[in-house]
């Protein structure tokens, strides 16, 4: 079926590539190119690089507006990073892919916060995109165990694979149920979240796993700062 994917981050790029192998992805909606890295050179979002490699047209508005024209009525949102206006949400079927068992870990960093908390299981939720952050009714949800060896990279990879399986199950006409339980929130990772306290080995291990391989935890070794993945 024809779908648009709204994605920016590496997790979104992974889901985009997997979806493109199964569906007709008519466009990618992503964030504009931005300066990045120490040299502050303008760089394309990871999802855009994937779309260009696959020959998928790319849309990069500064912010999506109600007047945005999309070449499909079904939109899969995954790690996009911008709010979508209600007028636009009402024009089609918008489904969000969230790598946690909602309502646990709503927000920007669900995988990282899950590992930081020492969770032993997580999962993927497909839900309707609504104005409130990650609060829409659920179309599909499935859990998986976290092993002591899993880092964020491994969890994101497993979540991307599961997300596409769940989307295949619910499209083109999902049914929805309300989210159940008390929500918790996964705030974005701040510099303080990267700091290791080596006097707390279990906490330090959770931190290293949560921030590997994409961010890195920070500590000192023989008086010198080090980054650990």
Model-derived features: where do they sit?
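One-carbon transfer enzymes
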Residues: 1-225
């Amino acid at each position: 079926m024809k779908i648009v994917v709204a994605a920016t981050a590496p997790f979104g790029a992974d889901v985009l590539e997997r979806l493109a192998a199964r569906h007709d992805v008519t466009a990618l909606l992503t964030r504009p190119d931005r300066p990045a890295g120490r040299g502050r050179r303008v760089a394309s979002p990871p999802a855009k690089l994937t779309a260009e490699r696959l020959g998928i047209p790319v849309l990069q508005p500064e912010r999506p507006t109600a007047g945005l024209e999309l070449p499909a009525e079904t939109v899969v949102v995954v790690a996009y990073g911008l709010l979508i206006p209600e007028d636009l949400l009402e024009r089609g079927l918008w489904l969000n892919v969230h790598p946690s068992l909602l309502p646990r870990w709503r927000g920007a960093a669900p995988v990282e916060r899950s590992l930081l908390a020492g969770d032993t299981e997580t999962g993927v939720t497909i839900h309707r995109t609504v104005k409130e952050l990650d609060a829409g009714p659920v179309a599909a949800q499935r859990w998986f165990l976290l092993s002591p060896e899993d880092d964020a990279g491994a969890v994101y990879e497993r979540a991307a694979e599961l997300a596409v399986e769940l989307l295949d199950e619910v499209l083109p006409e999902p049914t929805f149920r309300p989210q159940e339980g008390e929500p918790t929130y996964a705030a974005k990772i701040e510099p303080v979240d990267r700091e290791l306290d080596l006097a707390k080995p279990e906490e330090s291990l959770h931190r290293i796993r949560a921030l590997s391989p994409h961010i890195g935890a920070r500590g000192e070794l023989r008086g010198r700062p080090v980054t650990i993945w």
